[in-house]
Amino acid sequence: MAMTTRNNNNVLAISKKQLGVLAASAAVGALRNHISESSPALLQSAVGLGKKALNKVRNRRKQGNQQIITHVGGVGGSIMAPVAVSRQLVGSKPKFTGRTSGSVTVTHREYLTQVNNSSGFVVNGGIVGNLLQLNPSNGTLFSWLPAIASNFDQYSFNSVVLHYVPLCGTTEVGRVALYFDKDSQDPEPADRVELANFGVLKETAPWAEAMLRIPTDKVKRYCNDSATVDQKLIDLGQLGIATYGGAGTNAVGDVFISYSVTLYFPQPTNTLLSTRRLDLTGSLADATGPGYLVLTRTPTVLTHTFRVTGTFNLSGGLRCLTSLTLGATGAVVINDILAIDNVGTASAYFLNCTVSSLPATVTFTTTGISSATVNVVRGTRANVVNLL
């Protein structure tokens, strides 16, 4: 029996379709009234759910590499040694960009050095004297960049990242630390106490990767092309690599440096040749160009102590009384050599060698050494020095 209603005293029939529309309209109206009355509570509930989700994201970031499985003796942030760790390395193509006239931005990644393990506390392979000062002209930190930076007066680092890549097994014991010191003339840390006080520091096991991001300030500084009295005025800071707690002195990893630097104000090309001269008393008289090595002598031994890895050509001379005897210690290979002895007056030498890790030295033994001079430049094994 159909429902009826009266309109103007007339009886009208309502179909099932019309009845459904009326019911839906009534339901929508009731829902709208409920939302209007309950809107504050619904809004508060939505805000609460948002806060819970945000807190979960923050907690995950704070946990970092924390293991999902709890390991006995481990705390938050600890990692478990896997069976094997491997990293595939690919070549880095340098990128050049320029937004303003007279400047260029260089982005690249370079190999810095091999890291050897040590039982005691060792910084920068035992080489002291502010080895890794952050300046694009520093030939002991960069091998590729100085050839470009030597054509500019000023620089500004946009980003700098140190990346430690292991090459040892997960059974290797010890620690590897990367740090940054804002003062480029500060002495290297003497022990683990001083190391731990650095604000920009990353430590890891020899078998685990690590990255250290260096803070930059966009300040324009001068490229180091002369003998500067206060290095901290031209350097962004200095980097350091420390090892300790190991069971030997074997190679455990490599360190790469990635950077983006803007160079300003082109200038005549500065020298990439390193010159070191000792006077008659054995004191350093002149030091120009990159600090590839330190030249010292005793009355019987002239010593070249390398401060950076790579292949180099050395040409030098010394006042002495007898013939020269070549010697080498550490990870250095003599590729080619020519020595000219003038017994009783002076001798000269030309040398091509490859240094794969520090420390490494090349020596000449004779008698009656007084003054000496050596010029050093990066080269390749094809730069032979012997006579045909």
UniProtKB/Swiss-Prot annotation:
Molecular function GO labels: RNA binding; structural molecule activity
Region (P domain, projecting): 265-388
Location of the protein in the cell: Virion
Region R domain, interaction with RNA, annotated ranges: 2-102
Key words, A-Z: Capsid protein, RNA-binding, T=3 icosahedral capsid protein, Virion
InterPro entries per UniProt: Capsid_prot_S-dom_vir (IPR000937), Coat_P (IPR055068), Viral_coat (IPR029053)
Renumbered residue ranges of the record's region S domain, virion shell: 103-264
One Pfam family named in its UniProt record: Viral_coat
Region Involved in encapsidation: start-end pairs: 57-63
SUPFAM superfamilies in the cross-refs: Positive stranded ssRNA viruses (SSF88633)
Changes after translation: The N-terminus is blocked.
Keyword RNA-binding in record: yes
Cellular component GO terms held in the UniProt record: T=3 icosahedral viral capsid
Subunit and partners: Homomultimer.
Family statement: Belongs to the icosahedral plant coat protein family.
Its biological purpose: Capsid protein self-assembles to form an icosahedral capsid with a T=3 symmetry, about 32-35 nm in diameter, and consisting of 180 capsid proteins.
Name of the protein this chain belongs to: Capsid protein
